[in-house]
């Protein structure tokens, strides 16, 4: 029985001395007594290499490198005694989740949290933590009985104790956790003859749990000799740099005292690792109270960057220099980080420099396509075939890979199901997926071509194939009665899908292609799936469980799967976190992300039990738990110390001034501390260094091209650029090995967001020999020519989603009002409220099922919206009733369509316009309502347009003038041309161009006290209500028209129906009036026609410019669907914005328009 401790600071040769001793013994007696070297899991491979690579040894049968758990396996193999089934981490988590769900009604604090994502994982971690520190449910029960605690703390511990107790009962005699197996290992250790003959070394640890101390004590009692290596100066001050390993030293002394032996301490003080004064000074003086600075000799660097990407790029350049100038191998270099944002950048940046590397982290399997397929398949069943998991399942393309062009077919299928809102068993509706239903994809219905029909037939075939598989899976799972049945059904279904065969074939192909890591991932995923199924059967076997619970438990298990990737080559840069830092004796260590907040890092408790609760428990129960946050915070300097002392020749610290999210960052306080150790150690700002020495950026061809592009772009913009970049360009251009991709970069240099003007034949082939278009198409062109080109030239169509859009709402109102108007023949004035309600219900029953494939009945929200629509329609009818009673104008036509050649007698004729190229322009559309009033053989026409949005329900004459608002003038022009079809006299004149805002009225009053009187209240409410529906637009100033629009106008002075008010003398007032004389209206109509011709001419000339019209400080880009196509940029493209004179008075400006005889209907 002997306990030794090797004590020394970093780099003093403790491990080297141990390895030399072991090697010497192995050489002297290769088959002698066993030597056991215990190390952390992540260090075992490195230590094994030390023996394997020794040419005199070439391995050994005598020495074994193990971690604590593997050591227990080794002893159990010899002694036996472990009859229970060992639980994996995933099995433990699944069991605890199931227990929590079973007993959630017994919980006091956590009852409402048991379904939260990650709760069972946290609870599992807490129970494992208790086991590591030998805290049993009995400890918790006794503590709760003996102490007066806060209610929340008591309920929390009672809940944890309850599940812990159930867990212990569940596994008792049948299963065993890794912590329990170690406890059993302690009990039988004395029976091991192998251990009795062994010398045991423990290296690489800085602290131990209570359970591990118990193992060490048992080893001391049983083995010939136990030696523990500690990185400490032997100072047991709890506030020193070496607090953590010194605490271990204290525990070892207590173990020795308990066993009545002496702890033999061997001190190591001579530095062996560091090859220069800088690193020796860094190690020895880092924790010194009084610093003795020395002259800096260049072995330590501190880099400052503006961003973490710039920082990682510079580290990559430095690594290239290390391998080129210092003849380092990649395996001589390590990068240590703390901030997880760096891990992503290593993956993206280092391959650009052709630097091989291995990041020592375990990645979750969750987001791999295979795992996504499995989890989505489970979620499809859980959510009753919800569209989201269904599409995730299909888009993995694993179950559909046997289809030709499957990715394209899946995109088509997604467009269809998203537009139709396919969910639940609607996936099985063959009528819904009939080929004819594919004629409407997006907003435009069209006849299918032969090619399209064949594509959609393949889409339906693919859909049916995946549905058959899901039904097979669902049927098999529903027929299962217990967990073993579920697991068997899942596996057999995967076999039926040929998934194993597909995965193995795909893996072999990846190997052939040299993508060995991806191939290894497939192997690990399949093995992981099988392991989880085995765990389910092991833990639950024939236990009855609902399908819902099984799927939840299965998913919990899948969440635990992680990739454990073996390095693909030995010569590669090692990357790890500073906390683990298992990269001893590297020639160059890069410590990146040395920012305040990362090093030191604020430590906060993430366990269920808070730090304060831990302290109370430790004091009252006389047990030790895992360190609290304040203790861990004290160890931050030690973490930095261990990380920076891994290098033997050079250490580079780097930090950035800006984080991954653009936030400001400060350098670590340790940077100043390190600078203070040396005279002459300066921080090198990477940006300034590169400006001063541009050649320092030219370490790798790929990155040199990137920086070359940036420099040449700056040069083109007349900025100062070093001449060396022009030389670099010439060299790369003339070198066939370096100029690959250079031409592509140069085209980007002169990139300007300019489109190519189409030649007229090409424009004609796109748009046709005749333009048949709606008014909105021309308005769209005047907003931006490219918008028109993308929409009507390229015919790009945004995916339509199964939801209510603004234009859907507008269509509902239009259709419902037309239905009711036709029913009452436009006579609203005699409708009472009861009749209005009945008509509204009848209209919506006819209209709503036609909206977006019965969207309005798809869920409770849309059914509520339907009711609100009914309220709005009723309010609108009440307003129309009021307006109808007080005007001489009567509705003449509702939803009046117009085109060049009418389809029936109800439609109006639109006379073609002719472009400058002689191309006919046929305008088509639909006028919501035409009202007419006849007096003295003269008929006056009102155009009424229903708008469901407030901004669009305004007539802006400036927009009319510039062609941004062409609708109303066009409608009036069409109506004036169709007197006969409207059944009016030959002399027809414009009355009003008016918008009716269909909306849900919201009333507000400044002084609600005014509404105390009931009669007054009703009157005021009615007035306010009617004011909300006042027509807006432009009215003919002819008094015959004005008087007819509101028959009470002379009496009330200001109309609450139309935008007209009268002065006391009976003339039209300027305030509250929007009027123009008949000639002016005709000039606007003529100008509007000219805008049509001008616009159509530009279209046929092939204009496609990205040139949005900026009007009223707003761009049409704000609501444009084609920004991802045109790539409009507010900085680059601002010079292309079109502007118009917005200060004009449109009434005055329009007077310059000359009317021809045919333009005035007199």
Swiss-Prot record:
Q: Which InterPro entries match?
A: ADDB_N, DNA_helicase_suAddB, DNA_helicase_UvrD-like_C, P-loop_NTPase, PDDEXK-like_dom_sf, PDDEXK_AddAB-type
Residues in UvrD-like helicase ATP-binding domain copies: 1-275
| Keyword Ribosomal protein tagged | no
Binding residue positions for [4Fe-4S] cluster = 784, 1117, 1120, 1126
Which key words are in the record? 4Fe-4S, ATP-binding, DNA damage, DNA repair, DNA-binding, Exonuclease, Helicase, Hydrolase, Iron, Iron-sulfur, Metal-binding, Nuclease, Nucleotide-binding
Keyword DNA damage listed? The answer is yes
Which residues are involved in binding ATP?
Answer: 8-15
Annotated ranges, domain UvrD-like helicase C-terminal: 269-583
* Co-factor note (free text): Binds 1 [4Fe-4S] cluster.
Q: What is its EC number?
A: 3.1.-.-
Q: Which Gene3D superfamilies match?
A: 3.90.320.10, 6.10.140.1030, P-loop containing nucleotide triphosphate hydrolases
GO BP? double-strand break repair via homologous recombination
**Molecular-function GO terms, alphabetical:** 4 iron, 4 sulfur cluster binding; 5'-3' exonuclease activity; ATP binding; double-stranded DNA binding; helicase activity; metal ion binding
Q: Which PROSITE patterns match?
A: UVRD_HELICASE_ATP_BIND (PS51198), UVRD_HELICASE_CTER (PS51217)
The protein's required cofactors: Mg(2+); [4Fe-4S] cluster
Give the similarity note.
Belongs to the helicase family. AddB/RexB type 1 subfamily.
Q: How does it assemble?
A: Heterodimer of AddA and AddB.
Question: What other note does the entry give for this protein?
Answer: Despite having conserved helicase domains, this subunit does not have helicase activity.
HAMAP family given for it? AddB_type1
The free-text function statement in the UniProt record for this protein reads:
The heterodimer acts as both an ATP-dependent DNA helicase and an ATP-dependent, dual-direction single-stranded exonuclease. Recognizes the chi site generating a DNA molecule suitable for the initiation of homologous recombination. The AddB subunit has 5' -> 3' nuclease activity but not helicase activity.
Annotated protein name in UniProt: ATP-dependent helicase/deoxyribonuclease subunit B
- Please name the source species: Staphylococcus haemolyticus (strain JCSC1435)
